[in-house]
Design a protein with these regions (language model features):
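C-terminal amphipathic/interface module of NAD(P)-dependent oxidoreductases
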Residues: 229, 247-257
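N-terminal Rossmann NAD(P)H-binding glycine-rich loop of SDR-like oxidoreductase domains
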Residues: 3-20
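Rossmann-fold scaffold of SDR-type NAD(P)-dependent oxidoreductases
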Residues: 6, 52-58, 98, 205
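NAD(P)-dependent short-chain dehydrogenase/reductase
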Residues: 134-180, 186-187, 194
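Adenosine-cofactor binding site in Rossmann-like domains, unifying the SAM/SAH pocket
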Residues: 21-45
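Catalytic helix-loop patch of NAD(P)-dependent Rossmann-fold dehydrogenases
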Residues: 76, 80-84, 91, 104-145, ...
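Mid/C-terminal beta-alpha module of Rossmann-like enzyme folds, strongest
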Residues: 191, 198-242
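NAD(P)H-binding glycine-rich loop region in Rossmannoid oxidoreductase-like domains
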Residues: 40-77, 88
Length: 257
């Protein structure tokens, strides 16, 4: 099996390629330098010339807050880029795995979201990932994997942000009224590599066990790091909050168990 993995410089793409290497599965990782996903011609050239058995599409615009000010660019990456890859996968009749987000839901209610619940994104980022889902769903061979609150050794994430702000400021304000499941890309990559070797196409939710608020997550980060940082819990209406998104975007991952 030979796989193409986009977004290899990000935390998930990096770990997926490593997991493939550990299993002696050939995986070619590309980033914007090797294949700009917004360039349809380049996407076609790279995928068609590689003789790949499947494409794992990790590359994405993930800066949620910045997306509100950069709608066109976020759409170009998350929607147009996804379409470019999907078109070639459909033409070659090879599977495509697309990573989406819990932010395709509005976060209302008290229960965790299931795979085929109605989608209603509240922000630009969630909307573009939803539109990407609609594109990928048209492929006969597709995996849509919704993930949440991911963190890993490579790339940027909430843990690294908290550690940086803790050192710079000594105090942070973090929302305590948004609940989710922090998910380690090392664990996620194992599931992804297992899944891509099957023909069990469809939509999946993939997160680690357990739920917490961003505030609880931040407190645990500083505890594990042995840092003395003042963490103030605030709600999402607070002007100095780090996160401003759906209240309860947490997703039910029982299908993948």
């Amino acid at each position: 099996m030979k796989l193409l993995v986009t977004g290899v410089k990000g935390q998930l793409g990096h770990d997926i390629v490593n997991e493939c290497n550990n299993r002696n599965i050939e995986a070619v990782g590309v980033d914007v330098e090797e294949m700009d996903i917004t360039d349809a011609g380049k996407v076609a050239e790279v995928i068609k010339s590689g003789n790949y058995n499947a494409v794992i599409h990790c590359a994405a615009w993930t800066a949620v807050d910045k997306a509100e000010d950069e709608v066109e660019l976020c759409t170009k990456v998350n929607v147009d880029g996804t379409r470019n890859i999907a078109n070639i996968c459909k033409e070659l009749d090879i599977p495509m795995m697309y990573f989406s987000t819990d932010y395709v839901f509005d976060g209302q209610g008290e229960t965790e979201w299931k795979e085929y619940d109605e989608r209603h994104p509240l922000n630009v980022y969630g909307q573009t990932k939803y539109e990407g889902e609609l594109i990928v769903e048209t492929l006969p061979k597709h995996f849509i994997v919704r993930i949440a609150w991911v963190f890993g050794i490579n790339g940027n994430n909430f843990i690294k942000t908290m550690l940086r702000l803790g050192k710079e400021r000594g105090a942070v304000c973090v929302v305590d009224d948004q609940i989710g499941s922090p998910t380690y890309t090392y664990d996620l990559s194992k599931l992804v590599v297992d899944m891509i070797q099957t023909d069990k196409y469809g939509i999946y939710h993939a997160t680690n066990e357990g739920l917490c608020s961003w505030y609880e997550f931040a407190c645990e980060i500083f505890k594990q790091a042995g840092m003395s940082v003042e963490v103030t819990p605030v709600d999402m209406t607070h002007p100095n909050t780090i996160i401003l998104n759906p209240i309860r975007p947490s997703i039910d991952h029982s299908v993948v168990k």
